[in-house]
Structures are given as structure tokens and as C-alpha cells.
Amino acid sequence: MNYIGLSAYDTANGPGVRVSLFVSGCTLRCKGCFNKESWSFTAGRPFTAETEAQIMKALDSKWIAGFSLLGGDPFEPEHEAVLAGLLERIKERFPDKTVWAWTGRTFKHVEKSRLLPYIDQLVDGAYVQKLHLEKQGAWRGSSNQRIIPLYQGRIDESPAAQAEAAAAEAEH
């Protein structure tokens, strides 16, 4: 698996200061995508043990709120084994940090993914240019995309989780 970006201090992709990984490869190719350079599976550089060590070191700070996984599309089948292992190790070492992930697919299309048990918030849905959100910090590109709270790989239907997701969508 390749990646096109790693940010140790990201404030645009989820709440608080986060570590963000942008993976390479996306077969969806949404019109108006902000990250077209990520479409190729060979873009960027290979994800290695050294890359993972950089992520873990960056996460090992009290002021880092969590980890964000973007792309490309992290839910491409080619990424599943590497990313499931990475997310499992992140959650084992940093159980109090949140994991956010973005996909152009709907929850229904990724509900069996091995990544979901390690994700706290999933932003799902293809980017639709005519529904573009102008507001900075929207955590999603278009209004059709949803912020879905997850618990153990399933949609968290608890009132608290749903209220938090609704507030995130309304606020951002």
C-alpha cells in the first residue's frame, strides 16, 4: 500500500489536533475531488514499518486527539489488511484517542470491512460537487456525506452518540 501524505498536526480532518494519513488509490474518482493525485494506487511512497513508527510517535502526545484516515479511499480492498493491522495497533496503544475515517462508499457498502471495529466516526458517501460545503472545518466535502458514530464496528444508536454526530454535522 502507498500513501501520499502524513500529517502529524492536522486540524482540518476531525476534532482537535490529529495525526492524518492519506492513502493512495481510489477507484471511485468523484467529479470535483479535492485530492485527485491520490487516485493512483502507485502515487506517493510505500507504507512501511518506519511510516507506522512515525504515526505512533506522533500519536504519543497528550494534546493529539486522535488519528484520521483519508485518501484516496482507505476502504479499497487492497488496503484492508495493512490498515486493519495499523488501526488495531493504534487502538491497543492509544485506546482514548478517536479514529475517524473517510470513504466515498456508503456504510452499507463497507459494513463488513475489517477496519470498522477500530473506527469511532465514519464519514461516508461519495463527494457530490453540486452539494459542496463551503464552510471550513465541515469534516465532509458535500452535504450528502454523513458523520456516523460507530461502536465495535456497528452504527452506535445510543442517544449520546447520535447527538454528538448531529452536533458535529450542524456545527461544521
What are the functions of these language-model segments?
Residues S7, V123-A126, Y151:
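Residues at the C-termini of beta-strands that transition into short coil/loop
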Residues G71, T103-R105, G125-Y127:
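Short secondary-structure boundary segments
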